[in-house]
Amino acid sequence: MTYLQEASRNAITVPKLQAMRDAGEKIAMLTCYDASFAALLDRAGVDVLLIGDSLGNVLQGQTTTLPVSLADIAYHTASVARARPAALIVADLPFGTYGTPEDAFRSSVELMRAGAQMVKLEGGEWLADTVRFLVERSIPVCAHVGLTPQSVHAFGGFKVQGKTEAGATQLMRDSLAVQQAGAQLIVMEAIPTLLASDVTKQLRIPTIGIGAGLDCSGQVLVLHDMLGIFPGKRPRFVKDFMHGQPSILAAVEAYVAAVKDGSFPGPEHTF
């Protein structure tokens, strides 16, 4: 089966992402939930595959990511890992699985055993001790700041973050704190472009934007969104790369090319 073939390019590792950032090469990231798509995305040149808790929305039909369990993420991580992609495999820690450093470690071990090479946690300054605890135990960490979907009820909906002076200051503090704690990657979601640019300049680690402007070290989208598979209104930061393309592979290749050459996101995709 094609999804069990060995990857034909050099592996993307955590140090490789840092080298890409330092060299000014943009990082293309997409969500992925199964072996077949893992093989296709890898063939298209995607650098990072994220087993996101967004699977709750796009696979399970949930209205939020909160119902997604650790077992759900582990199952889909194992499915992606079986494709043996060259792309780095990052797995989300779901809501309620990292309340303490010890909880986060136990949850991360399960995902790493399933095939993850890095785990992603939502939170900033308050999460620094947990990030440090994981990194000290050889678990690479991606932090997620800005609009963190697991906090949807605390935010009162899916709203742009960092728009006020206080909010921007806190987001900068959050980003610096998780970097200082040892995070090797950070996702910034739905924040003003200028703020994302400032944070990217202040940090030494790669920043991955989703609705955070062009100046981030890379971009991420939910796979279904960039293929035009979204019920209802299209999110502002999403572009339908499937439109006008002859195949899914061509659409993903177009996404990778647009991220790499800086043509995505455009002003219409940012805040």
From Swiss-Prot:
PANTHER family: 3-METHYL-2-OXOBUTANOATE HYDROXYMETHYLTRANSFERASE (PTHR20881:SF0). Catalyzes the reversible reaction in which hydroxymethyl group from 5,10-methylenetetrahydrofolate is transferred onto alpha-ketoisovalerate to form ketopantoate. GO terms for cellular component: cytoplasm. The keyword Nucleotide-binding does not apply. Pathway: Cofactor biosynthesis; (R)-pantothenate biosynthesis; (R)-pantoate from 3-methyl-2-oxobutanoate: step 1/2. Keywords: Cytoplasm, Magnesium, Metal-binding, Pantothenate biosynthesis, Transferase. HAMAP family: PanB. One of its GO terms (biological process) is pantothenate biosynthetic process. Binds 1 Mg(2+) ion per subunit. This is 3-methyl-2-oxobutanoate hydroxymethyltransferase. The active site is at residue 189. The keyword Cytoplasm applies. Homodecamer; pentamer of dimers. 3-methyl-2-oxobutanoate binds at residues 53-54, 92, 120. Its EC number is 2.1.2.11. Belongs to the PanB family. It comes from Paraburkholderia phytofirmans (strain DSM 17436 / LMG 22146 / PsJN). GO terms for molecular function: 3-methyl-2-oxobutanoate hydroxymethyltransferase activity; magnesium ion binding.
